[in-house]
Amino acid sequence: MVSPATRKSLPKVKAMDFITSTAILPLLFGCLGVFGLFRLLQWVRGKAYLRNAVVVITGATSGLGKECAKVFYAAGAKLVLCGRNGGALEELIRELTASHATKVQTHKPYLVTFDLTDSGAIVAAAAEILQCFGYVDILVNNAGISYRGTIMDTTVDVDKRVMETNYFGPVALTKALLPSMIKRRQGHIVAISSIQGKMSIPFRSAYAASKHATQAFFDCLRAEMEQYEIEVTVISPGYIHTNLSVNAITADGSRYGVMDTTTAQGRSPVEVAQDVLAAVGKKKKDVILADLLPSLAVYLRTLAPGLFFSLMASRARKERKSKNS
């Protein structure tokens, strides 16, 4: 039985429910609308930011660098494509100018050929890059080399070679182009690092070391360049389905020549390039572009280091057993 007091309170309860629901729903939809508008404005600003921007991309002849060239070109950027193979760069330019139907005005790219491990060539290359359009808006440090091997079997020369390509080369090119950006108080430095710049896995020591150094340098650069209004973005992809593992060097410097299973199952470089474009357009500072497990491993390394180290030791044992079987 419902008491008289309860009966009297029922209309009040229903009235309160009605008021609450009618107040919350508009508020909820309003918040969603504001969020959607914010994302739309971000997208529009990103498109405008990239259109007609002078973008330098290293390692543009293959893999992620080549796909980045395609998406930045389609976005209307003025490209300066860099690499060691001039013929491959020319072929890429022909491909870009012949096949891309875009809604924005595009510009014929320039090419600059040089080796990132040659410090003298980098200085000359930077001068040549600046001659193309007179300035640089965005530098995408993408070129790199991977490595497979045990620490004890790896010569120091191999360690140096990986560091020269992945760390010292990009640092030297960045330093060579920074003065022109500082003078204009405008510019954006992008470092394509790796998830292994945030945590390390066995038999990748030289590569992981070079990417940890990359992360540290560009984090410092971001803080120091804030006064000049220069943006710095570090992008850390996980496995990408490219020839990175095939072209990796081994402990003695020879070519690895194997497509690792993890690499073969990695993300499409086309998708990753689109994510890079979006991150640059939104001026993000630090981005992880990896699947769930590698991303979780980054946090596990910090929150539960003992467990992380045990898992890496187990991985090392399994890889050794697999190679010896």
UniProtKB/Swiss-Prot annotation:
Keywords: Endoplasmic reticulum, Membrane, NAD, NADP, Oxidoreductase, Signal-anchor, Transmembrane, Transmembrane helix. Substrate binds at residue 194. Residues 1-17 are cytoplasmic. The active site is at 207 (proton acceptor). Its EC number is 1.1.-.-. Residues 39-325 are lumenal. One of its GO terms (cellular component) is peroxisomal membrane. SUPFAM superfamilies: NAD(P)-binding Rossmann-fold domains. The chain crosses the membrane at residues 18-38. Its main location: endoplasmic reticulum. It is a single-pass type II membrane protein. One of its GO terms (biological process) is ether lipid biosynthetic process. GO terms for molecular function: acylglycerone-phosphate reductase (NADP+) activity. It is found in: Endoplasmic reticulum membrane. InterPro entries: NAD(P)-bd_dom_sf, Sc_DH/Rdtase_CS, SDR_fam. It holds the Pfam family adh_short. NAD(+) binds at residues 62, 64, 207, 211, 242. The keyword Transport does not apply. PANTHER family: DEHYDROGENASE/REDUCTASE SDR FAMILY MEMBER 7B (PTHR44196), DEHYDROGENASE_REDUCTASE SDR FAMILY MEMBER 7B (PTHR44196:SF1). Putative oxidoreductase. Belongs to the short-chain dehydrogenases/reductases (SDR) family. This is Dehydrogenase/reductase SDR family member 7B. It comes from Homo sapiens (Human). The gene is DHRS7B.
